C-alpha cells in the first residue's frame, strides 16, 4: 500500500470512529434525559396531579420518555451556540450535559421527599 492509500484508510477509520463515539455520547445523553423525564413525570408530576386535580392513570412509559429525552436533547441543547462551546471538545460538552442532567435528577429526587 502506498502512502496516499494509507492516509485515506486512516482518515476513514478515524472519521467513522469519531462518528460512533459522537453517536454513543448522544445516546447516553438522551438516555439520561429520558430517565429524568420518566422519573420526573411519574414520581413528581403524577402525585401532584392526583392530589390536586384527582387525575388518575397519568403514566409515561420508558419509550415515550426516551423520545421526549431525545427531543429535549436535540431541540434544547442543540439550539445554544456560543464562542465558548465552539472551543470545547465533544467530551467536555457531554460531561457538562451529563452533569446538568444528573443535577436535575437529584433536584427531582429531593423534591419528591417534600411532597
Swiss-Prot record:
<dbReference type="GO" id="GO:0005886">
    <property type="term" value="C:plasma membrane"/>
</dbReference>
<keyword id="KW-1133">Transmembrane helix</keyword>
<feature type="transmembrane region" description="Helical">
    <location>
        <begin position="20"/>
        <end position="42"/>
    </location>
</feature>
<feature type="transmembrane region" description="Helical">
    <location>
        <begin position="58"/>
        <end position="78"/>
    </location>
</feature>
<keyword id="KW-0812">Transmembrane</keyword>
<keyword id="KW-0472">Membrane</keyword>
<protein>
    <recommendedName>
        <fullName>SPbeta prophage-derived uncharacterized membrane protein YosE</fullName>
    </recommendedName>
</protein>
<keyword id="KW-1003">Cell membrane</keyword>
<feature type="transmembrane region" description="Helical">
    <location>
        <begin position="95"/>
        <end position="115"/>
    </location>
</feature>
Amino acid at each position: 500500500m502506498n502512502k496516499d492509500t494509507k492516509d485515506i484508510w486512516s482518515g476513514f477509520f478515524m472519521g467513522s470512529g469519531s462518528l460512533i463515539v459522537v453517536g454513543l455520547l448522544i445516546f447516553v445523553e438522551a438516555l439520561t434525559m429520558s430517565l429524568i423525564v420518566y422519573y420526573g413525570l411519574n414520581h413528581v408530576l403524577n402525585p401532584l396531579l392526583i392530589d390536586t386535580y384527582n387525575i388518575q392513570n397519568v403514566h409515561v412509559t420508558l419509550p415515550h420518555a426516551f423520545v421526549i429525552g431525545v427531543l429535549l436533547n436535540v431541540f434544547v441543547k442543540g439550539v445554544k451556540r456560543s464562542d465558548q462551546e465552539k472551543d470545547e471538545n465533544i467530551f467536555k460538552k457531554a460531561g457538562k450535559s451529563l452533569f446538568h442532567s444528573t443535577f436535575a435528577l437529584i433536584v427531582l429526587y429531593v423534591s419528591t421527599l417534600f411532597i
